[in-house]
Amino acid sequence: MAEDHGRTLLLFRHAKSAWPDVADHDRPLARRGIEAAPVMGRWLRDAGLVPGQVLCSTARRARDTWQFAQPGLAATPPVTFDARIYGAAATDLLALVREVPPATGTLLLIGHNPAIEDLALLLAAAPASAAGRGAAGATPGDLDRMRSKFPTAAIAVLDHGSLPMPTLARSITGWVDRAA
């Protein structure tokens, strides 16, 4: 029987980007994004959610989000910049998560909407219980809030035994909106 590693998936939508006259992949962070990313890095550290591994889109705004968030972690986990994250669908991201070695306790995935939001909803809405909660512990209200807005620099925290399982122990325990 496989050991339960208490794995946690952190889905981090990149911080607010600017819209200069450059290709979409090359868009930098806006001032608000530059300010929000370090706050989110510190929040992860303070919440005890320092990742053991990071998967990050190759888009500049995602790389910049990691660059500004990482110092707040007070750790330097290995990071992989993966071009497959940019433009991916939720199912593509799920496949990338499945490639991560089982020994990784906490995985941080920095990417883009709609895929980040769609993956969070997919995992958080795993089969509902009689109590009206998904197996992930997310209520219909939690899911509705996430559907209505998964803002830039927001993080969904999904905790479970082995990434990604069809049923989760709990989720959206750390739904964190971007820094004010």
Annotate each language-model stretch with its function:
Residues 2-84, 88, 92-95, 116, ...:
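Active-site-proximal alpha-helix that buttresses catalytic centers in soluble enzyme cores
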Residues 104-124:
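A glycine-rich beta-strand to alpha-helix segment
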Residues 9, 106-108, 155:
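Residue-level preference for the first positions of well-ordered beta-strands
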Residues 17-19, 117, 165-166, 180:
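Short, acidic Gly/Pro/Ser/Thr-rich loop/turn segments
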Residues 98-109, 166-175:
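A polyampholytic, Gly/Pro-enriched intrinsically disordered region
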Residues 1-2, 71, 99, 147-148, ...:
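Short secondary-structure boundary/capping segments
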